[in-house]
Amino acid sequence: VLLFLFLVLHHSTAVKEHDALKKEIKAHQYYSAQLFGTHESKGYWPAECAFSERIIKTLTECGIEWSVIANSHLSRTLSDYPIKYGTGGVMCDLPNKADQVTTKGNTWFSAQKDARGGQFAVPYCYLPYKSKYIDPETAQEYKITVVPMADYESYEDGYSAIGTSLLDPIVAGAPTSLRPPLVLFAHDGDNAWGGGSSYYNESVTGFSHAATTKGIVPSTIPQYLKDHPVPDTEVVHVEDGG
């Protein structure tokens, strides 16, 4: 079982003040150690997956080495992000040009469920990177590994059993990637189907076995990062949001 760091209360991490966020993370570490006897997790799950580069300093000071982010907040920073309106398109503010980087996604695919979806660059949006924060008062740099959850695929996975065909666009779009893409399923499991016994004991098991027969390797975040370390030079910008 992989344990994540979380908060004592359900806050939007991205807007919490440094000292308050640090106190909550430390409290979670303390209570986790009391419950499980130790707390060795180096990973962080921000509530609602709401992340901001402004919290990187706090996370590193708490001994956190990596955090989950939403992969839509990588895709929306790319200079060739394809704006799409209506079903499966942008249903929130358009990407802020201040967040735009010169990098291009080049290979894109669009997907939606229940009219909600997005545009994702492959393999860019399915690879862990480094992200950094520079303290404006001291100019000190803080860096952390960011691990993108698969927004669209997680939504599908959270509501019904899925097949490995869901991964086909990602596999097809990443034949020359130096690191294999990581498709991270993460969702509000208890809010839908993806959190009960049939999900964990049947769907996850069946999907994992089917993926293995196609040469896809089931893994955990720590194992992936150990097998495929993120180069310190692979620094990206992450758009604020969840």
What are these regions, as identified by a protein language model?
Residues V1-E48, Y142-D157, P180-A186:
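Metal-dependent polysaccharide deacetylase catalytic core of the NodB/CE4 family, i.e.
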Residues K22-S32, I56, V171, V204-S208:
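Generic structural signal for well-ordered alpha-helices
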Residues E53-V68, Y200-K214:
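Short, surface-exposed basic-aromatic patches at helix termini and helix-loop junctions that form
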